[in-house]
A protein has these predicted regions:
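Central cavity-lining transmembrane alpha-helices of secondary-active solute carriers
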Residues: 57-74, 266-278
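C-terminal membrane-cytosol helix-exit motif in multi-pass small-molecule transporters
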Residues: 185-205, 390-398
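Helix-loop boundary and gating motifs at the non-cytosolic
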Residues: 6-65, 225-265
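Juxtamembrane intracellular "pre-TM" segments in multi-pass secondary transporters
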Residues: 1-20, 200-230
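Hydrophobic core of transmembrane alpha-helices in multi-pass small-molecule transporters
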Residues: 28, 96, 107-123, 234, ...
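Helix-to-loop junctions at the C-terminal end of transmembrane segments
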Residues: 69-81, 166, 275-287, 371
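Structural signature of the two symmetry-related core transmembrane helices
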Residues: 84-99, 290-305, 384
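Intracellular juxtamembrane helix-capping segments at the cytosolic ends
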Residues: 122-135, 327-340
């Protein structure tokens, strides 16, 4: 059976557009680089002197900058090319790792977090555009989950490698974590070179049409349930912008060491490696809305386990179930790509970026306030509440729109 699935996966890849395949190669490198350090960013900035509230403010400021810069990315990608925008995003992430590496204060470390948020947001806008322009509607979830399966493999290994390196360099302090950011910078530079040399534009850029505001107006006129989907996007992505509290909570409250935090992240990505492709096939076959509704409770269970965990093993299980959020996010992203005509994907992704950006500004401030005033565990209860609201909104969207 494994051989059959692998063979079908290779056959699927062979018939895809070159841009889709090169983007997978790029993701393999960039995700390893991100996986070395992402789970340690909040801990690193904390080691430089920031507390939970400061972490929230730093993330919120990064969200403001990210929102202002990434809203026009989709529109610019339509006009000047997806390739140029992806190169820009990778360049910003490279600068973020350099800022982390040079940081001697939490403010400079916060600059690194802000730049990372901006660069990551660029990729979140542009990467789905590659899938949107190269994959057929009836196999889009399968293709996106296949990409996620293949490119999640480095993230299985990277956190454990990071834990070993941190231990070797002196432990979970600023000096022990700093070398990882230099390694990540080198990896991101390689990913940038791959895109620069080999990634073609999946669709030729066109400078026809009006301004970015006119593009947004066209999306609302010609799209399907656009306003409701934007509200859904805002609610459903709150966990993305409070995720930095998970490793911080594991270390500060549960006393997790570098290896436990690394294994939590590896377990998170194991969900993608082993379940992404089956989830994609089942979503395309039996319904995307049903699949999101099935996956979300597992993510909520992960948050409960994180709070009540009596030992390291339960923390790692929580990390595994936390990965179900990503499985659901990819499935719902495929729904979003089909709500507007293909020629409007740039403007549509820009609007989605705006909605996520607003959340990235507000959510960290709310999270910091909740942590300081009510208690750390209430941050995760708040996240569970957002997912309940998300499912309520999703249920109001007809199955004819979500393909089941």
């Amino acid at each position: 059976m494994l051989r059959s699935v692998t063979s079908k996966g290779f056959d699927f890849l062979r018939r895809q557009h070159r841009a889709f395949k090169v983007n997978i190669y790029r993701n393999l490198i960039s995700k390893f680089s991100i996986g070395l350090t992402q789970q340690y960013q909040s801990i690193y900035v904390s080691a430089l002197g920031a507390g939970a509230v400061e972490l929230g403010y730093v993330s919120s400021v990064g969200g403001v900058a990210s929102t202002l810069l990434t809203v026009p990315v989709g529109w610019l990608a339509d006009r000047y090319g997806i390739r140029k925008m992806l190169i820009t995003g990778l360049g910003v992430m490279l600068m973020s790792f350099l800022a982390f590496g040079l940081a001697q204060s939490w403010q400079v470390g916060g600059l690194g977090m802000g730049l990372f948020t901006m660069g990551f947001s660029f990729a979140m806008v542009v990467c789905p555009m590659i899938c949107g322009h190269t994959l057929r509607n009836e196999e889009r979830v399968t293709g996106m989950q296949l990409c996620d399966t293949v490119t999640a493999l480095p993230r299985l290994v990277a956190p454990v490698v990071a834990a070993y390196l941190i231990t070797s360099f002196g432990g979970m302090n600023a000096g022990g974590m700093r070398p990882l950011f230099w390694i990540s910078a080198a990896g991101m530079l390689v990913a940038l070179v791959i895109v620069y040399l080999w990634l073609p534009n999946p669709i030729e850029p066109s400078r026809k049409g009006g301004s970015i505001i006119q593009g947004f107006g066209s999306v609302f006129r010609e799209g399907t349930m656009v306003a409701r989907w934007l509200v859904y996007t805002m609610i459903s992505t709150v966990p993305m912008y409070l995720a930095f509290y998970i490793p911080y909570y594991a270390k500060e409250i549960k006393g997790a060491d570098p290896y436990v935090i690394g294994l939590m992240d590896s377990a998170y990505w194991a969900s993608s490696v082993f379940l992404a492709l089956p989830v994609g096939v089942l979503a395309d076959r039996y319904g995307r809305k049903r699949m999101v509704a099935l996956l979300t409770p597992f993510y909520c269970l992960a948050l409960v386990l994180l709070v009540v965990s009596p030992n390291d093993a339960v923390l790692i299980v929580a990390g595994l179930l936390n990965g179900f959020f990503m499985l659901g996010a990819i499935t719902q992203a495929a729904i979003g790509l089909e709500l507007v005509p293909r020629e409007m994907l740039g403007s549509w992704n820009g609007l989605n970026s705006l909605s996520r950006g607003l959340v990235s500004i507000a959510a960290p401030v709310i999270g910091g306030f909740v942590w300081a005033s009510l208690g750390p565990e209430y941050v995760f209860y708040f996240l569970i509440a957002t997912q309940v609201v998300k499912l309520g909104i999703l249920w109001t969207i007809p199955s004819s729109v979500t393909r089941g």
